[in-house]
């Protein structure tokens, strides 16, 4: 409920009225008074650890942290007094004295919050000796932590605890030796980390980042430089909603087809749309759901989606008893890799071992998914050879000095380049469930369902990122749910275990808002880094769907050809071998 009670305050001698209970920081920013901060995340991390947000309050001797103190009637606040400016400078200088300031070679050089705050404070001289801890980490793990860049803001701790409920990070040491490390003194590879990457996208510096695989692709000895290799790039749906942000381009200009041109300029031989494999996933998953519904007593319910490796990892570590309820369908990434190393290789007369398949994803967990057992369909090595996040591919493009603004648009390659609107919405929370039910409805009734207000898929209620839905297919009502974030997943599972709710089909995405807010996406400023603030990415994908000539996976001609020429039918023996997992 919105608080309508107002209090009268002054900020920099200007009288204002703001809602009672408002934090000083929010009151200042809402009224145009800039207050810097480094640790604050609204409703998540409000601990005043960095002390960069301090302000002066009349009648209080000490400076006050504005992120965790509320306005009060008659309060007079100074945001930029000499005393405040000096305190902020000293606090940031002390942070820099323990920070590895290799800014020119840092992956966050262009969007480091610490660097920006230091610049805004006009810090031009290092007044304190620089000493930072040595980086001791497993360099092969997809998530890298550099202790020399950690400013102890505790954002990662709070995001993992409050949003993802995995508690991977914790505070260790005392006094000046206080730091953040993996909980229970574990190595990161021994922890239950799902590799969702939310700690990375909320870190103000490069203390947390993905393992960089750009050099393996674009280095002097990289895959693109090897004339004996056929290089294939496959692009996830959510990438098109965000890649332009790294170049300051609007979504209207930074289209999927312009991204194809960009990847061709980089040197990839083929560029395919993972939306194709999303359509393929829908064909398998929707038919699997219908097959289970025909023998309801044989299975435990609900059936969960399985395309998000962060969610699958979470289920493995937290609720292994639920694994039989996960769809056996591989993710679109792994389905595509299997098809490329078999069907595509045979069709083009290329030995599978001579194909390098690079998946471009909004996700860090995909870097681990590609090495899981059963992901070697041709018997010649991994189906997907490398995963680059959206951030990594953009760094690669910049390193090649490609002027994206001058490139024209280009279609995805055949024969695996056709996709539907149903495949595009995989990148948004609820999209997988909706796409699957569009095709399930057609399989049962022989007719396509309406899309939009007249759709048989009805939203019964929505709370935050949780949606409860229902669809009537020939008199059979399926009760469904779609949710994002692992904390939401835990709450739903616990509610089901208590008998408070029952569902037939549930979609889970590890990242809040879905893949559009994945751990590998471009990093936005912390005050624009909540799911509601990234609604434009969701709308971008929904727009692609609305404009698509074909909006049903079962109408994808390229998918139909794949079944006719190679897979035979959904859930066939060959389809099961290539497109499904035997066990989790």
Features from the language model and the residues they span:
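Residue-level recognition of alpha-helix initiation/capping sites
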Residues: 19, 141, 151, 194, ...
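Iron-sulfur-associated redox domains of electron-transfer enzymes in respiratory
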Residues: 8, 20-74, 80, 84, ...
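Generic start-of-chain signal for non-secretory N-termini
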Residues: 1-23
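Short strand-loop junctions, especially beta-strand C-caps/beta-turns
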Residues: 12-14, 183-185, 238
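Mobile "lid/hinge" segments at catalytic clefts and subdomain interfaces of large enzymes
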Residues: 167, 200, 393-397
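Fe-S ferredoxin-like electron-transfer domains
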Residues: 51-195, 201, 208-225, 230
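Residues that cap or flank secondary-structure elements
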Residues: 16, 138, 148, 191, ...
């Amino acid at each position: 409920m919105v608080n309508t009670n107002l209090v009268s305050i002054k900020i920099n001698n200007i009288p204002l009225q703001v809602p009672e209970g408002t934090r000083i920081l929010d009151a200042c920013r809402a009224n145009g008074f800039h207050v810097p901060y480094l640790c604050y995340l609204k409703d998540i991390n409000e601990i005043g650890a960095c002390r960069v947000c301090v302000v002066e309050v009349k009648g209080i001797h000490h400076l006050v942290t504005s992120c965790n103190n509320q306005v009060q009637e008659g309060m007079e606040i100074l945001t930029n007094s000499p005393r405040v400016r000096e305190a902020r400078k000293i606090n940031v200088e002390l942070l820099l004295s323990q920070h590895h300031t290799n800014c020119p070679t840092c992956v966050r050089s262009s969007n480091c919050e610490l660097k920006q705050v230091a610049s805004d404070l006009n810090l031009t001289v290092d007044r304190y000796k620089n000493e930072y801890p040595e980086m001791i980490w497993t360099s092969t793990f997809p998530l890298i932590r550099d202790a020399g860049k950690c400013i102890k803001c505790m954002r990662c701790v709070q995001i993992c605890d409050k949003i993802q409920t995995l508690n991977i990070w914790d505070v260790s040491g005392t006094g000046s030796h206080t730091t953040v490390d993996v909980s229970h003194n574990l190595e990161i590879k021994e922890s239950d980390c799902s590799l969702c990457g939310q700690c990375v996208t909320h870190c103000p510096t490069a203390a947390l980042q993905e393992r960089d695989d750009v050099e393996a692709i674009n280095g002097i000895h990289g895959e693109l430089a090897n004339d004996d290799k056929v290089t294939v790039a496959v692009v996830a749906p959510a990438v098109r909603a965000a890649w332009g942000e790294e170049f300051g381009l609007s979504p209207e200009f930074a289209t999927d087809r312009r991204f194809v041109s960009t990847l061709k300029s980089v040197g990839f031989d083929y560029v395919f749309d993972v939306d194709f494999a999303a359509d393929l996933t829908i064909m398998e998953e929707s038919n699997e759901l219908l097959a289970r519904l025909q023998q309801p007593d044989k299975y435990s319910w609900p059936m969960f989606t399985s395309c998000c490796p962060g969610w699958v990892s979470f289920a493995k570590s937290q609720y292994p008893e639920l694994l039989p309820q996960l769809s056996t369908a591989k993710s679109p990434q792994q389905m595509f890799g299997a098809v490329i190393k078999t069907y595509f290789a045979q069709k083009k007369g290329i030995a599978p071992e001579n194909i390098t398949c690079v998946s471009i994803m909004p996700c860090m967990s995909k870097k681990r998914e590609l090495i899981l057992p059963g992901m070697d369909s041709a018997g010649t090595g991994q189906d997907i050879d490398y995963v680059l996040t959206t951030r990594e591919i953009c760094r690669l493009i910049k390193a090649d000095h490609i002027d994206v603004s001058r490139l024209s648009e280009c279609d995805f390659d055949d024969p695996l380049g056709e996709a539907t609107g149903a495949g595009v919405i995989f990148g948004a929370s609820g999209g997988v469930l909706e796409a699957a039910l569009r095709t399930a409805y057609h399989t049962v009734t022989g007719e396509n369902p309406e899309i939009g207000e007249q759709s048989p898929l009805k939203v019964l209620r929505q709370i935050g990122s949780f949606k409860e839905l229902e669809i009537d297919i020939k008199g059979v009502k399926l009760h469904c749910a779609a949710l994002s974030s692992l904390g939401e997943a835990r709450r739903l599972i616990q509610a089901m275990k208590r008998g408070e709710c029952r569902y037939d089909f549930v979609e889970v995405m590890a990242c809040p808002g879905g893949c559009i807010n994945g751990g590998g996406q471009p990093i936005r400023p912390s005050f624009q880094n909540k799911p509601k603030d990234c609604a434009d990415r969701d709308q971008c994908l929904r727009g692609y769907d609305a404009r698509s000539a074909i909006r049903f996976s079962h109408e994808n001609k390229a998918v139909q050809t794949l079944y006719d020429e190679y897979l035979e039918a959904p859930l066939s023996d060959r389809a099961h071998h290539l497109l499904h997992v035997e066990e989790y």
